[in-house]
Curated annotation (Swiss-Prot):
Region (Interaction with target base in tRNA): 102-104
Catalytic residue positions: C107, C205
Name of this protein: tRNA-specific 2-thiouridylase MnmA
Localization annotation: Cytoplasm
Originating organism: Shewanella oneidensis (strain ATCC 700550 / JCM 31522 / CIP 106686 / LMG 19005 / NCIMB 14063 / MR-1)
Pfam families assigned to the protein according to its UniProt record, in alphabetical order: tRNA_Me_trans, tRNA_Me_trans_C, tRNA_Me_trans_M
Top class in the EC scheme: transferase
Length: 372
């Protein structure tokens, strides 16, 4: 399909300014394209006064410096209540149920592209919003808008944005999605932006780089239990199943076991009923492999999902190689996905995101694994 460009002149864009390099360059590029640009900084977590992990004040300072340099307004908004209700409580409930959620995906759905868009609409009278995500949008002549992978394969963030609606994608601009990361940093450097060499943020969306076990333990009581081999031999103890995920190799504290080979130990299963962490040696241990999965809570960006029997590709985690697969609908909200080859460490609670070439079709939540 042929792509068409939106008319830029006079259109007002509210850019989500995070205090990082990607949003900084996004604002600059949109100004170059003729948009009327303003920034909006979101505060989504109420940190303690002595909180060493949250850098919200520093990020706001950097965002303000960038906006001052570009000569644009910076607005601020507090979405902490919305974040707690719609993202953090979901995050805790999933961990409590023994699954491994992805809060960044929920944050994009509920905060960055919902609460933010509503605020930009109602208060700031925006035509578009923009974020520093590495994805692209394509406006087609038939009136549809598609979300595409970012040009930089290593930074592509479409996996985190699959829950966006067609309408949200149509109202959003992603300037850095057309660029490689090194190009973004070079533009920021050339423009003298303070964020040009600022490191990328990591950790839980908006909560920062806390020690995860310590942070989670503040909200959910830990339940220590045994670590067993796949054969049922007790070889250690864990502090709580919620601290572990399938395929995990580090932090198990069970190296140098007698009668074991030199292969590293991996988490291969979590027995919720017995509160037992099951481990096995080798990254392709049979208990770690799946032939497929059941995926529910389906969402398709353009409202129409792939047809029954489609042979496409899926990612079950960020930055994973594409996995060829075949889809079968069990009902309107459940997909049976069969992989062409067995896949390691597919994790219930995580998202499965489907692609047709460069187009991100949508996805759902991994509910059950198909083994054997």
């Amino acid at each position: 399909m042929t792509s068409i460009e939106p008319t830029h002149t006079g259109k007002k864009v509210i850019v989500g300014m995070s205090g990082g390099v990607d949003s900084s360059v996004s604002a600059y590029l949109l100004m170059q394209q003729g948009y009327q640009v303003e920034g909006l900084f979101m505060k989504n977590w109420e940190e303690d006064d002595n909180d060493e992990y949250c850098a919200a004040a520093e990020d706001l300072k950097d965002a303000q410096a960038v906006c001052d340099k570009l000569g644009i307004k910076l607005h601020t908004v507090n979405f902490a209540a919305e974040y707690w209700d719609n993202v953090f409580e979901y995050f805790l409930a999933e961990y409590k149920a023994g699954r491994t959620p992805n809060p960044d995906i929920m944050c994009n759905k509920e905060i960055k592209f919902k609460a933010f868009l509503e605020f930009a609409d109602d208060i700031l009278d925006a035509d578009y919003i923009a974020m520093g995500h590495y994805v692209r949008r394509r406006d087609n002549e038939d009136g549809t808008t598609q979300m595409l992978r970012g040009v930089d394969n290593n930074k592509d963030q479409s996996y985190f944005l699959y829950t966006l609606s067609h309408e949200q994608v149509a109202r959003s601009l992603f300037p850095v999605g057309e660029l490689e990361k090194h190009e973004v940093r070079e533009i920021a450097k050339q423009m003298g932006l303070i964020t040009h060499d600022k490191k990328d943020s990591t950790g839980i969306c908006f909560i920062g780089e806390r020690k995860f076990t310590e942070f989670l333990g503040n909200y959910l009581p830990a339940q220590p239990g045994n670590i067993e081999t796949a054969d049922g031999e007790v070889i250690g103890t864990h502090q709580g199943l919620m601290y572990h995920t399938l395929g995990q190799r580090k932090g198990l504290g069970i190296g140098g076991m007698k009668n074991s080979n030199d292969d590293p130990w991996y988490v291969v299963d979590k027995d919720l009923k017995r509160n037992v962490l099951v481990v096995g040696q080798g990254g392709h241990h049979p208990r770690l492999m799946s032939n497929g999965m059941l995926v529910n809570q389906l969402h398709w960006v353009d409202r129409k999902g792939p047809i029954n029997g489609s042979q496409i590709v899926v990612k079950t985690r960020y930055r994973q190689q594409d996995i060829p697969c075949t889809l079968t609908y069990l009902d309107d909200n459940t997909l049976k996905v069969v992989f062409d080859e067995p896949v390691a460490a597919v994790t219930p609670g995580q998202s499965a995101v489907f692609y047709d070439g460069e187009v991100c079709l949508g996805g759902g939540i991994i509910d059950q694994l198909i083994r054997g």
